[in-house]
C-alpha cells in the first residue's frame, strides 16, 4: 500500500425509502446540465481481464493519468467485487462460482458479468478534484442519468442518504450494493441500476462504478462520456501503465493477503 494519505468513500444505509433528485429539474443544482470536465480521455478496454487485473489497471491509471479519464471494461469470467472495508467471510461462499476481488474503493458487494463497468480517474491537478467526494459522485451520476434518459425510461437519482425500505432478494446478501440505494445512486422504475464507490489520495480520485443490465456493446458508454465532457478523446495506454498494472495484479490484488485483509 502507498504511504499516501488515502480515504475511501463508503455510504451505509438504513431502512428508509429514498426520495429522488430530478436529473433534469433540480433548483439546488443550477449547474446540473453543465459538463463536469473540460476535457476527458476515454479508454474502451476491449480485453477481458481477471478481477485482479481490472482493479490493478484502475489503480495504475490513477497513478499515471495526466487528465480526467474514464475506462469501460469487461470481466474474463463472472466476478464479485466487495469494498475495501468488507469482510471476506461475507463473500467466501461465492468463491466456487465467481472470481472474488477486494476493491481499493469502499462500498458493498457487486456482482459483475452482465453489467457495464467503468472507472473514472481525476488527477489532483484537475479543478474537479477540489470538490467534495459526494458532489463528484452526484455529478457523475447526473451525467449517467442524462445518458440513460436519451434511450431508456425515466431515470432519477436517489435523494435520501439511506437505503430503500425493501426486502432483499432471496439468496442475495443484505450488503449487496444494488439492494441498498443511497444518496445520488441512479434509479429506474424504483430500482437501483447504478452505484459507485471512491478512493481519494494525494494523487487524485478514483471512482469505480457498475451499471446493471447494460452490456459493453451498447452506445451507453459513449453517451455517458459525452455527458461528462464535450471534449472527449481516446486514450492510448502506455506500456509503462500496463507494466505497473501487472505488478499490482500480482503483488497486491491477486494475493490472498489482500483478498482476506478483513
Please state what every model-predicted region is.
Residues 1-38, 154, 164-173, 230:
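Intrinsic disorder/low-complexity segments
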Residues 33-95, 99-103, 109, 230-262:
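Active-site loop/lid in soluble adenylation, ligation, and acyl-transfer enzymes
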Residues 43, 47, 171-203, 208:
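Short terminal or interdomain "cap/linker" segment that borders an active site or interface and mediates
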Residues 80, 86, 165, 181-182, ...:
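Ser/Thr-rich, low-complexity intrinsically disordered terminal regions
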Residues 90-92, 127-131, 216-222:
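Short, conserved charged micro-motifs
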Residues 108, 112-127, 207:
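Residues forming anionic-ligand binding surfaces in small-molecule and nucleic-acid pockets
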Residues 128, 135, 151-153:
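Compact, glycine/acidic-enriched structural inserts
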Residues 140-172, 176, 199-262:
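Long, positively charged amphipathic alpha-helical accessory segments at protein N-termini or as interdomain linkers
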Amino acid at each position: 500500500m502507498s504511504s499516501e494519505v488515502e480515504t475511501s468513500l463508503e455510504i451505509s444505509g438504513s431502512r428508509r425509502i429514498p426520495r429522488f433528485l430530478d436529473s433534469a429539474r433540480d433548483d439546488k443544482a443550477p449547474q446540473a446540465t453543465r459538463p463536469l470536465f473540460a476535457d476527458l480521455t476515454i479508454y474502451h478496454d476491449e480485453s477481458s481481464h481477471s478481477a485482479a487485473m481490472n482493479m490493478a489497471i484502475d489503480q495504475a491509471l490513477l497513478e499515471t493519468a495526466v487528465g480526467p479519464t474514464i475506462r469501460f471494461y469487461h470481466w474474463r469470467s463472472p466476478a464479485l467485487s466487495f469494498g475495501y472495508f468488507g469482510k471476506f467471510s461475507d463473500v467466501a461462499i461465492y468463491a466456487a462460482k465467481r472470481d472474488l476481488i477486494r476493491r481499493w474503493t469502499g462500498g458493498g458487494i457487486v456482482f459483475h458479468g452482465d453489467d457495464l463497468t467503468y472507472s473514472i480517474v481525476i488527477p489532483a491537478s484537475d479543478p474537479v478534484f477540489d470538490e467534495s467526494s459526494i458532489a463528484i459522485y452526484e455529478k457523475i451520476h447526473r451525467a449517467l442519468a442524462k445518458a440513460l434518459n436519451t434511450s431508456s425510461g425515466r431515470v432519477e437519482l436517489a435523494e435520501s442518504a439511506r437505503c430503500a425500505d425493501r426486502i432483499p432478494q432471496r439468496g442475495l446478501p443484505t450488503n449487496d450494493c444494488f439492494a441498498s440505494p443511497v444518496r445520488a445512486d441512479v434509479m429506474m422504475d424504483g430500482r437501483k441500476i447504478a452505484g459507485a464507490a471512491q478512493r481519494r489520495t494525494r494523487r487524485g480520485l478514483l471512482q469505480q462504478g457498475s451499471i446493471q443490465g447494460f452490456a459493453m456493446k451498447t452506445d451507453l458508454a459513449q453517451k455517458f462520456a459525452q455527458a461528462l465532457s464535450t471534449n472527449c478523446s481516446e486514450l492510448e495506454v502506455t506500456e509503462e501503465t500496463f507494466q505497473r498494472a501487472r505488478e499490482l495484479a500480482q503483488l497486491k490484488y491477486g494475493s490472498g493477503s489482500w483478498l482476506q485483509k478483513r
